[in-house]
Amino acid sequence: MHGNGGQPAAGGSESALSREGQPGPSGAAQGQVISNERSPRRYSTRTINGVQATNKFTAVGNPSLQRDPDWYRWNYNHSIAVWLRECSRSHAKICNCGQFRKHWFQECAGLEDRSTQASLEEAILRPLRVQGKRAKRKLDYHYSQPTPNRKKVYKTVRWQDELADREADFTPSEEDGGTTSSDFDEDINFDIGGDSGIVDELLGRPFTTPAPVRIV
């Protein structure tokens, strides 16, 4: 601190703050001197204990890792999440204990072999098949959309064609007596007539003696 008239304080020497600058993020720390020279590429040079150093290779864009810790924390958490996901997928292919975290402890570090299970191949190939079907649906949608040189492609109803093919290929067997269902439909008359008691009961009319159903 300076005394009256701008003279140095008692002791004949300047304080540490006036000699090295304000402490903190904007100034130098103990034993550091910051040069005022700024590079066109936005990195600075420091002299630490007589050794010249620069943050040219440590800066990440304008806000470096030292000035913006949230950037480092976000990337760290993202990397950990990706690693845990890969551990879970790899563990599911070789063990069926349920949780891969159990193998981090010595008392339950053994592996349970899945090679004897019949569903091993299905468990490994199912993600690939599901992703393939999902990708095919997306491609089918884009293929059906109209383009300047092509009209919209509509889906083809295949179940009607398959039903017609089955009826055309049907041949009566010997157990059926060589007859089809159409032969029986011609001999049955389902007309119950207007004077039937069933019709009166459905309409809420007084119940009368129902007429017999005629079967020709």
Swiss-Prot record:
It comes from Chicken anemia virus (isolate Germany Cuxhaven-1). Its EC number is 3.1.3.16, 3.1.3.48. This is Dual specificity protein phosphatase VP2. It catalyses: O-phospho-L-tyrosyl-[protein] + H2O = L-tyrosyl-[protein] + phosphate; O-phospho-L-seryl-[protein] + H2O = L-seryl-[protein] + phosphate; O-phospho-L-threonyl-[protein] + H2O = L-threonyl-[protein] + phosphate. It comes from the Viruses. Residues 21-32 have a biased composition (Low complexity). Induction: VP1 and VP2 are detected 12 hours post infection, while VP3 only after 24 hours. Belongs to the gyrovirus protein VP2 family. Keywords: Early protein, Hydrolase, Protein phosphatase. Pfam families: TT_ORF2-like (PF02957).
